[in-house]
């Protein structure tokens, strides 16, 4: 099982209790925060990118929604050409986005991280955003 592999490799414990599963969950969460921090730091410096939600890493999960003045479709295509995969749209949150003043026709760009995302993937994303915005 995947959690057993993570536990064996990183923690050297057997997953026999909820506390050991919690340790693996904490390990995953910690890695996701490490990956997310450079992006949040970058976004803080960009006045033309609106981050939906907090810049504080402790207040976030590793999914980031941004709004820019550029067309999301165009930006997503440009990032995809750099082998950076992003999503665009409303992600079934139409009323929330409307309440936040987001143009529903444009929606948001969604950037998702998981614990096995590499640091170089994050660097490539930041470089692409910096290049195209």
How does the language model describe each region?
Residues 1-133:
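Pyridoxal 5′-phosphate
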């Amino acid at each position: 099982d995947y959690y057993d592999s993570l536990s064996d490799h990183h923690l050297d414990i057997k997953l026999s209790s909820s506390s050991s599963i919690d340790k693996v969950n904490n390990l995953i969460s910690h890695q996701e925060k490490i990956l997310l921090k450079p992006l949040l730091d970058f976004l803080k410096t960009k006045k033309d990118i609106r981050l939906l939600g907090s810049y504080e890493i402790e207040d976030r999960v590793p999914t980031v929604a941004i709004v820019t003045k550029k067309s999301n479709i165009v930006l997503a295509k440009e990032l995809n050409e750099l082998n950076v995969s992003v999503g665009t749209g409303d992600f079934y949150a139409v009323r929330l986005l409307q309440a936040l003043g987001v143009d529903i026709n444009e929606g948001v760009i969604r950037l998702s991280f998981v614990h096995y995302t590499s640091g170089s993937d994050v660097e490539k994303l930041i470089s692409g955003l910096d290049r195209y915005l």
